[in-house]
């Protein structure tokens, strides 16, 4: 179970990075000093609840568990920003500058936050 939890947490970390941090800019983010990825300090506390149900087609009943943590994380974070700030972010990562720009643009157009 510990390895499975680690796989799920790793997928969530990748989704968090996709939503909030990771952006490849040619010539500017070509190393880990400039290309930001989530670290332990960026991760929220998580409680992973496992439901064991063997896959009859998987080897010894195994299933893949990395993707289920990755796939919904970025959309969930972007939906939370929409709910909290009233603006939709159209380009990821949703950096503070991009969120602020979306709020200001929404206000200039007479939107929810304006």
Role assignments for model-derived ranges:
Residues 1-114:
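C-terminal catalytic domains of large/alpha subunits in multi-subunit enzymes
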């Amino acid at each position: 179970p510990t390895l499975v939890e680690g796989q799920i947490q790793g997928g969530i970390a990748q989704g968090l990075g996709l939503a909030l941090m990771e952006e490849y800019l040619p010539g500017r983010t070509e190393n880990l000093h400039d290309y930001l990825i989530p670290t332990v300090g960026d991760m929220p506390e998580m409680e992973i609840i496992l439901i064991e149900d063997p896959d009859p087609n998987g080897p010894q009943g195994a299933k893949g568990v990395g993707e289920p943590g990755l796939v919904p994380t970025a959309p969930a974070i972007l939906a939370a920003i929409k709910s909290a700030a009233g603006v939709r972010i159209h380009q990821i990562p949703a950096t503070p500058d991009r969120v602020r720009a979306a709020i200001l643009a929404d206000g200039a157009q007479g939107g929810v936050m304006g």
